[in-house]
């Protein structure tokens, strides 16, 4: 699997791995790259079956497989220890990595994540799946911003959204791959395993997230043995895109604090 690695800004730079959500594209993290690359070696990638890592995914594709293939690619790149920043599905992959490779994952940042899928989130995806079956890729792509962004943010950026729609259609991962990745997301359940995650965790959520209620992050916070929770009052599901200034400050402070906390505990 292809990875994109930024040059380390200094010797022994900590590595930060960015894992996007269901869309799978590493470019999702563009608003964070410039600030992160000043302090860390940053790993971005398109998830298997998407973008520049095309593949046909098995029907039983799982979050555990997503975690394993990423870890193997990191080891092949010479990376033994790394912090993880995961958004939604990416946060699930991050938790799986922390469970399966505890010696490798130093810190986890969960952005609008959850323990197991909430009934509201399941309802949102049910509607989106029906759009996919009835209207194809175009209907899926055109509806997607409604679940990602606040209404006023979208209303002020109509040309940008049209350009994003065209790009998403041009690079659509395919119906079968999308549904198999979505099914993996829906099957994931960390409610009985989260207490085994030993790395420090920062939870970031947006109170106005339409797709994943912020209560999901509260449940996650309560289940993890070593976590802190930060709530953004605005930004929607893609809060790192809509309010990068606020998000980046939380992310940078969280990474620095948790990495120091971990080093002090060793």
From Swiss-Prot:
InterPro entries to which the protein is assigned, alphabetical: AB_hydrolase_1 (IPR000073), AB_hydrolase_fold (IPR029058), AB_hydrolase_sf (IPR050266), Pyrimidine_utilisation_RutD (IPR019913)
Regions annotated as coiled coil: none
MF terms in GO: hydrolase activity, acting on carbon-nitrogen (but not peptide) bonds, in linear amides
Protein name from the UniProt record: Putative carbamate hydrolase RutD
Keywords: Hydrolase
NCBIfam families: RutD
Catalytic reactions on record: carbamate + 2 H(+) = NH4(+) + CO2
Function noted in UniProt: Involved in pyrimidine catabolism. May facilitate the hydrolysis of carbamate, a reaction that can also occur spontaneously.
Major enzyme class: hydrolase
Family matches, as Pfam families: Abhydrolase_1
One annotated GO biological process: nitrogen utilization
Family assignment from sequence similarity: Belongs to the AB hydrolase superfamily. Hydrolase RutD family.
E.C. number(s) listed in UniProt: 3.5.1.-
Matching Gene3D superfamilies: alpha/beta hydrolase
